[in-house]
Curated annotation (Swiss-Prot):
Record-given protein name: tRNA uridine(34) hydroxylase
Pfam families documented for this protein: Rhodanese, UPF0176_N
InterPro entries: Rhodanese-like_dom, Rhodanese-like_dom_sf, TrhO, TRHO_N
Entry-linked CDD domains: RHOD_YceA (cd01518)
Sequence similarity: Belongs to the TrhO family.
Keywords of the record: Oxidoreductase, tRNA processing
PROSITE patterns reported for this sequence: RHODANESE_3
Catalyses which reaction(s): uridine(34) in tRNA + AH2 + O2 = 5-hydroxyuridine(34) in tRNA + A + H2O
A single BP term in Gene Ontology: tRNA modification
Any one GO MF annotation of this record: oxidoreductase activity, acting on paired donors, with incorporation or reduction of molecular oxygen
Residues at the active site: 183
C-alpha cells in the first residue's frame, strides 16, 4: 500500500501578521519533514503537502489549533513517492490570483452543491427546480485537457485572471440555467462563483471541495479522464491514484 499521504486544503479567512505565520508554518512543517507548498495571504491559506500519515496528522493538528483554521478541511490521496522536491511557504497578495479585489471570499461563501447532489443532478439532467445544469470548468485549458465533466463548458482560458473577461463574453449563454463552477480542489470555483453572482449570473453554485472531493465521494460519476494536479503525479484518476503517465500520453 502506498506510504505517502498527500493533502490539499484551503480556507478563505482573514489572516494577519503573515511574516510570523509564515515562519511558524515553515518551522512546523519542516520539523515533521513535509514537502510541498503553502500559500498565505490576507484572504486565507492554500496548501499542498505530502509526507507520512502520522506527520501529516501532527501538522494538521497544530494548524487547526489556530481558531481561524479550526475547521480547515483537507482532501487526502496516496502515492508511492513524495511528489514534491522541497517545502515552500510563500506570502502572496491572493491565495489564488484573480485580480478583482472586490471579490472577497473570506467575507462569505457562494452557495455550494455537494458531490452527491451534483451526481444526482447530472444523472437526471436538471437540478431540483427543473433547470438545466451547466458544468463550468474554471481551470486552465491544459488542465481541462487531462479530463473534465462530460459536456462541461470550457472557455480555454490560459490563466485564472482571464476568467472575469470570459464571464462577460459568455454571460448571456448562462441565463435560465443552473451554473456549477468546478476546479481541482475548490479554491478557484469558489472565487469564480462569487464573481459570476456579482456579475448578475443567477443560480450559481460552486462544487464543494472541487473535483478531488467529487472523486472521493462519488467515484467520478460523469467525469471523463483524470484530474490534473500541479505536482509530479501529473494527474489523479477517479480512484485518487496517480495517473501521470496516462495523462501525459492522453494530452501529448
Amino acid at each position: 500500500m502506498p506510504a505517502v499521504v498527500n493533502i490539499a486544503a484551503y480556507k478563505f479567512v482573514v489572516l494577519d501578521n503573515l511574516p510570523t505565520l509564515r515562519a511558524d508554518v515553515l518551522a512546523q512543517a519542516g520539523a515533521v519533514n513535509l514537502k510541498g507548498t503553502v500559500l498565505l495571504a490576507e484572504e486565507g491559506i492554500n496548501l499542498f503537502l505530502a509526507g507520512s500519515r502520522d506527520k501529516i496528522d501532527t501538522f494538521l493538528q497544530w494548524l487547526r489549533a489556530d481558531s481561524r483554521l479550526a475547521d480547515l478541511e483537507a482532501k487526502f490521496s496516496l502515492s508511492e513517492t513524495v511528489p514534491f522536491r522541497r517545502l515552500r511557504v510563500k506570502i502572496k497578495r491572493e491565495i489564488i490570483r484573480m485580480d478583482h479585489p472586490a471579490i472577497q471570499p473570506q467575507s462569505g461563501r457562494a452557495p455550494a452543491v455537494s458531490p452527491a447532489t451534483l451526481a444526482r443532478w447530472l444523472e437526471q439532467g436538471v437540478d431540483d427546480q427543473g433547470r438545466p445544469v451547466v458544468m463550468l470548468d474554471t481551470r486552465n485549458a491544459f488542465e481541462v485537457d487531462a479530463g473534465t465533466f462530460e459536456g462541461a463548458v470550457d472557455w480555454r482560458i490560459e490563466r485564472f485572471t482571464q476568467f472575469p473577461a470570459a464571464v462577460q463574453a459568455h454571460r448571456d449563454s448562462l441565463r435560465g440555467k443552473t451554473v456549477v463552477s468546478f476546479c481541482t480542489g475548490g479554491i478557484r470555483c469558489e472565487k469564480a462563483a462569487l464573481y459570476m453572482a456579482e456579475s448578475g449570473v443567477e443560480h450559481v453554485y460552486q462544487l464543494d471541495g472541487g473535483i478531488l472531493k467529487y472523486f472521493e465521494e462519488t467515484g467520478g460519476k460523469g467525469f471523463n479522464g483524470n484530474c490534473f494536479v500541479f505536482d509530479e503525479r501529473v494527474a489523479l484518476d477517479p480512484a485518487l491514484a496517480p495517473a501521470g503517465a496516462v495523462a501525459q500520453l492522453a494530452t501529448a
